[in-house]
Design a protein with these regions (language model features):
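Acetyl-CoA-dependent GNAT
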Residues: 2-3, 14-20, 24-96, 104-109, ...
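Residues that scaffold the ATP/ADP-binding catalytic core of kinase and kinase-like folds
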Residues: 91, 100, 145
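Active-site acidic-Proline motif in GNAT/NAT acetyltransferases
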Residues: 94-100, 128-129
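Short, well-ordered coil/turn elements that cap or connect secondary structure elements
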Residues: 7, 60-61, 139
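Extreme N-terminal starter segment of soluble prokaryotic enzymes
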Residues: 9-11
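C-terminal "cap" of GNAT-fold acetyltransferases
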Residues: 120-134, 138-167
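Short polybasic/polar patches that bind polyanions
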Residues: 98, 115, 138
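Short coil/turn segments at alpha/beta junctions that flank glycine-rich nucleotide-binding fingerprints
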Residues: 34, 100, 117-120
C-alpha cells in the first residue's frame, strides 16, 4: 500500500524476514537520537541481531508488523500491533526521516489493520518524557486516559503513559 507521507511518498507493507536487521537498525538509531531521557542506556544496542529475527517471526498474521520504505526500498520506519486487543506497541522512524509524515503513514496503516481485525479502539504506552511521540499521537487523535505503566530496563525505571484512540 502506498501512503502519502506529506513531503514524499512512502510504501507501507507487511514486514518480511529480510527486514529484520533493518528494523533493528531503525530502532537503534531512533533510540539514540530520541530517548535522551534514558541517558547512557539509550546509547548502546539494546537487542541482539537474533532478537530482531525473532520479532519478525513472532509477528506474522494475525499480528501486525509493518515497515515503511523509502524511494530506494530501504526500511525507514516500522510499527507493530496486536489486533486481539488493539495495542500498538512499537512505532519507530529513523531520525534521518523524522518530520516527513512517515510515523503518520505507519499509524494510519496500523489503524487500518486493527479496524480490519474488528478493533474499535487502539491504545499504546509511551514514555512520559517522549514529548515528540506524544505530540504525534495526540495530533492523530490519541488521548491520555490516566493509566501509567512502570517497568525496569537496564536498572532504570521506565514510566509510560497509556493513550487511546477510538477507531
Amino acid at each position: 500500500m502506498q501512503r502519502d507521507s506529506g513531503s514524499s511518498e512512502v510504501a507501507v507493507r507487511r514486514a518480511t524476514a529480510d527486514d529484520a536487521q533493518a528494523i533493528g537498525a531503525v530502532f537503534d538509531a531512533a533510540v539514540r537520537a530520541g530517548w535522551t531521557y534514558l541517558g547512557e542506556l539509550a546509547q548502546k544496542p539494546m537487542f541482539a541481531p537474533e532478537d530482531w529475527d525473532q520479532l519478525v517471526a513472532d509477528h506474522g498474521p494475525p499480528k501486525v508488523l509493518l515497515v515503511a520504505t523509502g524511494r530506494a526500498g530501504q526500511v525507514v520506519g516500522y510499527t507493530a500491533a496486536h489486533p486481539d486487543d488493539g495495542e500498538l506497541f512499537l512505532l519507530f522512524v529513523h531520525p534521518a526521516y523524522a518530520g516527513q509524515g512517515i510515523g503518520r503513514a505507519l499509524l494510519g496503516a496500523a489503524h487500518d489493520a486493527l479496524r480490519a481485525a474488528g478493533c474499535r479502539q487502539a491504545y499504546l504506552y509511551t514514555h512520559e518524557q517522549n514529548e515528540r511521540a506524544l505530540a504525534v499521537y495526540e495530533s492523530a487523535g490519541y488521548r491520555r486516559d490516566g493509566s501509567v505503566r512502570e517497568s525496569e530496563f537496564g536498572g532504570t525505571t521506565i514510566r509510560e503513559l497509556r493513550i487511546v484512540k477510538q477507531l
